[in-house]
Amino acid sequence: MTNTNHKPARPRLMSATPLAFGVMCLALMVDATLGMALAHGVAEGDKGFIQESSGVLFWPFVYLGAKHMITGYDHLLFLAGVIFFLYRLKDITIYVTMFAVGHSITLLAGVLTGIQVNAYLIDAIIGLSIVYKALDNLGGFQKWVGFQPDAKIATLVFGLFHGFGLATKLQDFELSRDGLVPNLIAFNIGVEMGQILALSAILIAMGFWRKTPSFRMHATAANIALMIAGFLLAGYQMFGYFTA
């Protein structure tokens, strides 16, 4: 006799989430390595505009800053790791602010003072910042080192490196001194606006995933994928450093 009370198992629609997250991380890195020589690459059209511009061009530089952040693979991967286990808006705001402060300081100071280092090395460190955050999310420091770095300080420090990487790249464009400071401020404002837009999209996606049982089950796999992406970026930059 057929059991009419039997209910078919519900499909686990979210079981592919960590795989999708990993594919996204790896796809971003492959696209970055194929399309850019450096993690802070700038589109050819934007390069020409930056090099030829003179005078205060507030809104165009706001647009360029926002575009850089939204298409910045390294920034997005690092920030995804930062907010991975943050649930309260207060905590997210604190960490994002720490990153933004660090990014702003070195972006402005690096260009205005002319301090410059090898861009490959800076971008390799930025790749390792992604590895660090993924390892931190996995509890690796406490398990293997017996020491837990201060997450807020680490976010500020890596924000300094992220900003310095962009400052190093911008200095290659021989920016006009006419309107330089207002344009840099506008660019930085655009970066922060782009960061808000990118984080909003990430938070919406993460919010849906966190409500499912698969989040805790597959968080480890997702952070391993994030770590692999960071190693790929760092390895690519070191290859460029030794072969350029």
Regions picked out by a protein language model, each given a short descriptive name:
Residues 2-71, 147, 238-244:
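Histidine-/acidic- and/or cysteine-rich, low-complexity loops and terminal segments associated
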Residues 68-73, 78-243:
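Hydrophobic alpha-helical transmembrane segments in multi-pass membrane proteins
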